[in-house]
Design a protein with these regions (language model features):
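Cleavable N-terminal export/targeting peptides
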Residues: 1-30
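Transmembrane beta-strand segments that form the barrel wall of outer-membrane beta-barrel proteins
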Residues: 33-42, 68-80, 103-110, 144-149
């Protein structure tokens, strides 16, 4: 029941952010991008590192041009081998230099430690940078690094650093 409530909250926040961003839309034929990734959760903590796998969705029809560049809403989730889970929604930008893409993102989300690392709070913030290479017109391969933190909302804030290998496909 707890997970169902968390899912409803994330979907609701995605719908709210989507309606806000829908005012300034950029229409394209390829409007859905999926990112499937796998890597090492909390690689800098020898005691709590764990394998992770995740999925992220981006709808490029909801892009918005801002002073930071072109921003797009993203929603996703990741699980670790220790049964920890993180469900998130936020924004990302994309800056291209030829076939190379630099993609920073920020996503608040809900974290459940499972048998994994206790990050100190249910609400965690993920800041990430991804570097990807265009393999084909609609396919990218990349490497990303992120940091999860509760911004000192909890009594403790150990944070977690992770790296992932990304496969991105646009439909």
């Amino acid at each position: 029941m707890k997970y169902l409530r968390i899912c409803y909250l994330v979907i609701l926040s995605f719908l709210i952010s989507s309606s806000i961003l829908a005012e300034d839309t950029k229409v394209s034929n390829d409007n859905t991008k999926f990112n499937i990734y796998s890597g090492m959760f909390d690689f800098s903590d020898n005691g709590k590192r764990s394998t992770l796998i995740g999925f992220q969705h981006q709808n490029t029809d909801l892009n918005r041009d801002t002073f930071l560049g072109n921003l797009s809403p993203i929603t996703g989730f990741m699980f670790t081998a220790d049964s920890a889970a993180y469900l998130y929604t936020g924004v990302q930008a994309q800056y291209s230099i030829g076939a190379l893409n630099i993609i920073p993102s920020f996503t608040p989300g809900l974290y459940n430690k499972g048998d994994g690392k206790d990050l100190g709070h249910l609400l965690e913030f993920k800041s990430e940078v991804q570097i990807s290479l265009n393999l084909f017109q609609n396919t990218q391969l990349g490497l990303s690094y992120n940091h999860l933190s509760n911004a000192s909302l909890g009594d403790k804030n150990p944070g977690a650093n992770s790296y992932m290998f990304n496969f991105l496909k646009t439909f």
